[in-house]
């Protein structure tokens, strides 16, 4: 088939376009930043790893057409229009905003991360990750991650961006529906850097600790900064994140309060169920220190009573997990309530089997007794 541009590029039949279940992790995807596409270039780079083996080394335009057909099949027109507007919004910011620290926009591992974290990542073993981490509550991991100078530079970059927003009277989108302050890092040039952070630093850890929620197939992200102070957002209500895995790192500065409170992992059906005592956990932020948890782990933030707290948050998502989840009904491998229901069903089944066994044994014993004379 010849594509619509009439340039003679052969594109596989749209009726057979499929993705494979597991990504080609060793494959280096193309760079799509220079193309005018209906979707984010980062999405194409992530999706490329799921192309059939025969497609991986095809010409870039062939791969683009192949992936576009799949995306159009599943993405409504309204979603494409929204994505187009978001791209235009981001381009307007990137064209006009002058970064303060351009070195932040590309990963410089030794400048960004503490040595212990880098060592564990380079070894890429579960025991190496555990050696630098604490697990104060099941499924919640804390560890030192960022260098102090990186935290300070990112804080300075946020202040510079907010100053530009104020001076230019540019109306920006906030990180989510719950935070009225802060900024989406992806919107002012950090998308590629954060994608690299997810791919090379968060996904290896998530693959080891969160395989049941797609930790090994994370392929997109939403990265943002949030601000808490008496004249900013003060606290954050009880919620779950729109992510499979969430990285939350305190950048500073001086503050009191702001503790995170966790209340158990839940699927959509059980998100409003009661908390069990063993699921209660509170966490106090430390600048430079990260906390990693499942996105479906219910949590909130207590009031910041003085000072100013700023956190970097990276929601990491897996399109593969989300697609598979649509066809699943049992989430007992990660939902606390599903797990309790499953254990209760097992307990009842064992109890019923014991009763039945005792009944059979009683009947056998009665049959074996000699008849009364």
Language-model features: where?
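A broadly tuned preference for mixed-charge, low-complexity surface segments
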Residues: 196-202, 209, 300-302, 306-318, ...
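Fe(II)/2-oxoglutarate
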Residues: 1-138, 334-373
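Catalytic core of non-heme Fe(II) oxygenases with the double-stranded beta-helix
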Residues: 2-4, 207-337, 370-373
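Generic preference for well-ordered alpha-helical elements
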Residues: 40, 44, 60, 64, ...
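Non-heme Fe(II)/2-oxoglutarate
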Residues: 3, 101, 105-216
């Amino acid at each position: 088939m010849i594509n619509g541009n009439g340039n003679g590029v052969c594109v596989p039949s749209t009726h057979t376009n499929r993705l494979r279940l597991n990504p080609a992790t060793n494959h280096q995807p193309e760079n799509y930043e220079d193309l005018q596409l209906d979707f984010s270039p980062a999405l194409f780079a992530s999706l490329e790893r799921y192309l059939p083996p025969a497609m991986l080394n095809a010409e870039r335009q062939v791969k683009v057409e192949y992936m576009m057909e799949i995306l159009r099949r599943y993405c409504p027109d309204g979603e494409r229009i929204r994505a187009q507007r978001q791209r235009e919004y981001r381009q307007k910011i990137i064209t006009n905003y002058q970064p303060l620290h351009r070195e932040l926009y590309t990963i410089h591992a030794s400048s960004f991360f503490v040595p212990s974290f880098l060592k564990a990542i380079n070894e890429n073993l579960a025991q190496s990750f555990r050696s630098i981490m604490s697990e104060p509550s099941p499924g919640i991991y804390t560890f030192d991650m960022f260098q102090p100078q990186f935290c300070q530079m990112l804080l300075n970059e946020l202040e510079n961006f907010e100053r530009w927003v104020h001076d230019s009277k540019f109306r920006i989108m906030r990180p989510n529906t719950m935070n009225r302050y802060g900024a989406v890092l992806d919107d002012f040039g950090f998308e590629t850097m954060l994608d690299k952070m997810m791919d090379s630093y968060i996904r290896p850890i998530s693959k080891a600790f969160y395989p049941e929620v797609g930790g090994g197939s994370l392929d997109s992200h939403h990265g943002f900064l949030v601000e808490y102070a008496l004249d900013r957002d003060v606290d954050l209500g009880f919620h779950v994140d729109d992510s499979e895995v969430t990285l939350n790192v305190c950048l500073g500065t001086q503050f009191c309060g702001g503790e995170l409170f966790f209340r158990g992992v839940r699927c959509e059906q059980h998100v409003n169920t009661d908390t069990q005592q063993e699921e209660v956990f509170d966490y106090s932020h430390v600048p430079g220190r990260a906390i990693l948890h499942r996105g479906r782990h219910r949590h909130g933030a207590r009031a910041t009573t003085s000072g100013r707290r700023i956190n970097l948050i990276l929601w990491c998502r897996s399109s593969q997990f989300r697609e598979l989840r649509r066809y699943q009904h049992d989430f007992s491998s990660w939902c606390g309530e599903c797990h309790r229901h499953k254990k209760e069903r097992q307990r009842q089944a064992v109890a019923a089997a014991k009763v039945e066994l005792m009944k059979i044994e009683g009947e056998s014993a009665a049959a074996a007794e000699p008849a009364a004379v």
